[in-house]
Amino acid sequence: MFKYTRFERARIVGARALQIAMGAPILIDVPEGITPLDAALLEFEKGIIPLTVIRPS
């Protein structure tokens, strides 16, 4: 998996958690009653968050 800075990681997980909270489907199997933030963290750890980071070159 690509090495992200702590700022990129926070932005990715936060953006994905917001998407999940607004009704986006969760891409992994999660236990019942999990928070959107926890679901986003699990997706991030498995490397399946559908977001990309574009760095200026």
UniProtKB/Swiss-Prot annotation:
Its EC number is 2.7.7.6. One of its GO terms (cellular component) is cytoplasm. GO terms for molecular function: DNA binding; DNA-directed RNA polymerase activity. It is an enzyme of class 2 (transferase). It comes from the Archaea. Keywords: Cytoplasm, DNA-directed RNA polymerase, Nucleotidyltransferase, Transcription, Transferase. GO terms for biological process: transcription by RNA polymerase I; transcription by RNA polymerase II; tRNA transcription by RNA polymerase III. PROSITE patterns: RNA_POL_K_14KD. It catalyses: RNA(n) + a ribonucleoside 5'-triphosphate = RNA(n+1) + diphosphate. It holds the Pfam family RNA_pol_Rpb6. InterPro entries: DNA-dir_RNA_polK_14-18kDa_CS (IPR020708), Pol_omega/Rpo6/RPB6 (IPR006110), RPB6/omega-like_sf (IPR036161), Rpo6/Rpb6 (IPR006111). It is found in: Cytoplasm. Belongs to the archaeal Rpo6/eukaryotic RPB6 RNA polymerase subunit family. PANTHER family: DNA-DIRECTED RNA POLYMERASE SUBUNIT K, DNA-DIRECTED RNA POLYMERASES I, II, AND III SUBUNIT RPABC2. DNA-dependent RNA polymerase (RNAP) catalyzes the transcription of DNA into RNA using the four ribonucleoside triphosphates as substrates. Part of the RNA polymerase complex. This is DNA-directed RNA polymerase subunit Rpo6. It comes from Thermococcus onnurineus (strain NA1). The gene is rpo6.
